[in-house]
């Protein structure tokens, strides 16, 4: 009986250790990304992968305002010819607004993302979903037909 008790306690402690380790790795990665920010001529240079990682992290933690302001800042920093990156950022902003149930604003950002990258499937899917949510079934059907 005592051995069973020790096995159960060990399993629970292993689970707790795993969760703590995952949190520490996430915090370490976030600190490393923040330390890699280099100010260059009043602009902040940060790789697209890091920005999208931070976006996913903020969305996972439901820090919608942080995510939106960070992405808006980097949209203003991007050169005009980088439309794919801008489209991804607009898509993420639309997802944030959709998560806080501001559907009209989310639709606006999904449309901006669609104008920049009309061939991306996940952007089309998000746009169709927001059309459904808003009640614009006609446009939702058009987008769904494009998806298939």
From Swiss-Prot:
SUPFAM superfamilies: TPR-like. GO terms for cellular component: chloroplast. It comes from the Eukaryota. The keyword Plastid applies. Pfam families: TPR_8. InterPro entries: TPR-like_helical_dom_sf, TPR_rpt. It is found in: Plastid, Chloroplast. Keywords: Chloroplast, Plastid, Repeat, TPR repeat. The keyword Membrane does not apply. TPR repeats lie at residues 87-120, 122-148. Belongs to the ycf37 family. This is Uncharacterized protein ycf37.
